[in-house]
Amino acid sequence: MKRYQDNTFVVGNIGTPYTQEVLKTDKDSVTVAEISSFQLETAVHFHPTVSAILNITPDHLNRHHTMENYAAVKESITKNQTKDDFCVLNHEDSWLKAFAPKCPAQVIWFSSKEKLERGYYLVGSKICRNLGNGEEVLMDVDKMQLIGVHNFENVMAAIAIAAAYGVPMETILDTVKHFQAVEHRIEYVATKNGVVYYNDSKGTNPDAAIQAIRAMKWPTVLIGGGYD
């Protein structure tokens, strides 16, 4: 987005609070925001042009108590959207498949396991899309600097979000090819005595830890903590 539009702000749960940047924005600004379930609980008028829910897996149940409650809060990101807006959803997630018919926005699917009639998907190592006018091969995942199927899913979601907003595909794909892992998310640290170290301290639930382990291509030792 920053390559497409200079007046772009990356805010929210990812680091910089939305409230810290909001007074710098105007009607032509773009904000890319990661919104937590805690923040969605109290959001009343939040209306994204393009929203995305990448998955719904057990997390923060000490606050939300049940998966039904947690799913409802996550899905509420779309509550103020209309058919003029878009929502990017993971086709492999059973919660999101059940939610899709109720979603007020236009749904855009992505899948790492299934070739979709409409949406973004993997065929072997190729990221493809079909929006109703035939299959288009976008790129090979081997050209990326990220590893792991879950990262390929994240990239498909990011491509879908940016394309729905109107960013040229050439700009999107060039950005993807040069994008490096963000801090604490399967972030390469160092190689010492033949051992490769990755920092995945953002993986704060069992599913995230499982995805990180699956991304490893060699014998792996996990150093972790927590309650699960």
What are these regions (language model features)?
Residues F9-V11, P104-L122, L173-K177, E187:
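Beta-strand->loop->alpha-helix junctions that form or flank phosphate-binding loops
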Residues K24-K113, Y121-V123, C128, M139-L146:
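Flexible active-site lid/hinge loop adjacent to a nucleotide/diphosphate
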Residues Y121-M139, V182-A190:
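Acidic-glycine-rich active-site phosphate/pyrophosphate-binding loop
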Residues Q5-P17:
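Short beta-strand-centered segment that lines the nucleotide-binding/catalytic pocket of NTP-utilizing
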Residues V141-D228:
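Nucleotide phosphate-binding/pyrophosphate-handling subdomain across enzymes
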Residues I14-Y18, S37-Q39, S94, A181:
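Short acidic loop-to-helix transition motifs that present clustered carboxylates
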Residues D6-T8, D28-S29, T82-C87, G194-Y197, ...:
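Short active-site oxyanion
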Residues N13, L54, Y70, V88, ...:
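Residue-level signal for inorganic ion chemistry
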